[in-house]
Amino acid sequence: MTDTKTTKSKTKTTLSQKQKTAIGIGLLGILLIAILVGVVFVFQNKTDEFSVNTGVDASTLTGDAQTLTVGEDGVEITSGGIYELKTNIESGCVIVRADNADVELILNNVSITNSDGPAIYVESADNFYLQLVGSNTLVATTSSDFNGAIYSKDDILIYGDGSLDITSNIDGIVGKDDLQIDGGKFTISAEDDGIVGKDSIKVTGGVFDITAGGDGFKTSNETEKGDAEFTGGTFTINTGSDGLQIIANLLISGGTFDITAGNGSGTTSTSSQWLGSNTSDSSSTKGIKADSSVQIDGGTITVNSQDDAFHSNGNVTINGGVINLASGDDGMHADNDLTINGGTINVTKAYEGIEGGTITVNDGDIKVVATDDGFNAAGGSDTTSGRVGGQNSFAGDTSKVLTINGGTIYVNASGDGLDSNGNLYIAGGTTYVDGPTNNGNGPIDYGDSGCEFKITGGTLIAVGSSGMAVNATSATQTTVMINLTSSYTGALTFGDISYSPAKSYQSVLISSDKLSLGSTYTLKINNTDIQSVTLNNVITTSGTAGMRPGMGQGQQGGMQGGGRR
């Protein structure tokens, strides 16, 4: 990893006095200096411009490694080169003080136990490479000053075909600069965080089983860097806090993730989004969280989280992958823009399924089950819009937009099916909505005065209660809403259009290019004629819907004081 630093201070550790006096152990044999070109992480501000430039991969290094001789309290490495540890360290550590030189350490079927600090401590080096051979174990009881079983002040790259079992009373692996992992099998049990790369994290491969009281993976340099990229690997992560907690941008383009955060979706979130408190007052238990942006280009991701499954204080972009989410709060949440360009998304459980300041669906296969809204274009952080009714500050905000341009969408919501606190546009795709059975919500909802619900293409079938049901305000293809005098269950047909709702319904909204203007159609439920409608206008309403307070009949859905949108 390229580093422009010319000097590094040799700050002494606070390890045990025995370890400090162990310096000076003789190193036998011929020292082979490895010529290493650093690994440079190049992250752009926009997530679609993520790139990583790598120099010489550590796995291509050649030459014989020098075998380390273990002293009473461990080993100290003071110059660059390749070193191999084949002997257990029962009470001590490996310390690297090599100034600006590159150092590679090979762990070959060893165990290191240190009750007074890290098992491996890199105080100074240009780049530190750790190769795993065979089965290796690190056990560390450390302090807040050196808070990882592996603690490196400089860039670190870990690779190899071996395994590493880490037990730590604080963090598992800590890199204060850039941290890259290209392979290996990791089992980490940490009372706080599993793996921390302050400046950046890049994972291209490996198998990870992480149990952490804090976060699973974490970056923390909020002033300059803090990005993370995952291109491969298999991850099983169980955390007391967030599964992935990235201070800047997160990109996932490959890998298989199984993340359980907090107590999982079986526990309803009680943090600020419910109580209106500051998030610092309670622990975050999100599955995947990034302060700036989350971008998913590929991979298979399964999240079971107490709080949001996906969360960004900025934007969320889904370009591909297979994503399965269960959440005690939101399935996906972006304070700003949430864009879905492809992939398969299945939100099996959530309070609100997919939420963002703006939501744009261009493609993808999406299924959402939510106890409140399925899609909610509301915006703002969870901390600014509490769950308590009447606290919503986004009603009638034309900057909040839900747009569906393509894809296949299914929503089963107990609240509003598709909800925008501003405008709602459907221009393509196929959208099915099983909306609420209660009359306090509707299959479709959009903002107050000045906002619109416009249909210019695609297929929409939305069913649910009639109390807050709304039709489109404008359309370029034939659209009809039928409100019935009583509730029905069972399959419906309307001309060539058919659908089998999952629950009872009293309102049916259909927009499709299969409907012909001027034609008469009969709504059939369970093969029984229920109601005939002649489509004399592009937008037709048959039957009576309820109205929300202060609004004209059928103009809007949802209640202004009826909970967060």
Stretches with model-predicted labels:
Residues 2-565:
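A composition-driven surface/loop motif
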